[in-house]
Regions:
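N-proximal low-complexity "stem/linker" segments adjacent to membrane-targeting elements
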Residues: 1-28
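Short beta-strand/loop segment that forms part of the nucleotide-sugar
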Residues: 10, 23, 27, 34-46, ...
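Acidic helix N-cap motif at the loop->helix transition within catalytic regions
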Residues: 17-21, 49-58
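Short helix-capping segments at alpha-helix termini
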Residues: 30-36, 58-64
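A conserved acidic beta->alpha catalytic loop
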Residues: 44-52, 99-100
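Acceptor/aglycone-binding surface of glycosyltransferases and processive sugar-polymer synthases
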Residues: 57, 66-72, 76-86, 91, ...
């Protein structure tokens, strides 16, 4: 599918249980945003369950699904990188397979790009139901490093909805 408007890249590890729900929800959102001009790149990170088999079945039955199988568990970052190397869309949406962050936010994110933003990413402001250690570690490992790397060298425009 040359000239795709959108690629959704999804690293997956032991996600067989939720794969059908991810497929259903992401398909609806992508269709609503760009019609038929999209792909969903699912990258398997050496899962021990039937994630790869489910991904392969989806890629056979749905022309929008591209399935990648890594030979072993390389970790989230390298799996994401493999997915990014395979995607062909003008815009790329990165989503974890566990659906902790809803794919239904994609229309809001693409609207921000339509408004002129080159890069749009989401970050939860309120983390309900998580213990203090998880909140603190999320800030230290994600929030602080993002804050440090982006605020020092790049102009940012924060938009909160």
């Amino acid at each position: 599918m040359p000239g795709l408007k959108l690629s959704a890249v999804v690293p997956c590890y032991n996600e067989r249980e939720g794969m059908q729900e991810l497929h259903r929800r992401l398909d609806l959102v992508c269709q609503a945003c760009v019609g038929d001009s999209y792909e969903r790149v699912l990258a398997n990170d050496g899962s021990k369950d039937a994630t790869w088999q489910t991904m392969r079945e989806l890629s056979v039955s749905d022309k929008h699904v591209v399935a990648i199988d890594l030979s072993r568990n390389y970790g989230h970052r390298l799996t994401l990188s493999a997915g990014l190397q395979m995607c062909r869309g003008e815009r790329v949406f990165i989503l974890d397979a566990d659906l902790q962050d809803p794919p239904e936010l994609l229309p809001q994110m693409t609207a921000r790009m339509d408004d002129g933003c080159d890069v749009v990413f989401g970050q939860r402001i309120k983390r309900e139901g998580e213990i203090a250690f998880k909140k603190a570690s999320a800030y230290v490992f994600i929030g602080y490093s993002t804050e440090w790397s982006t605020s020092k060298s790049r102009p940012t425009r924060v938009i909160s909805d």
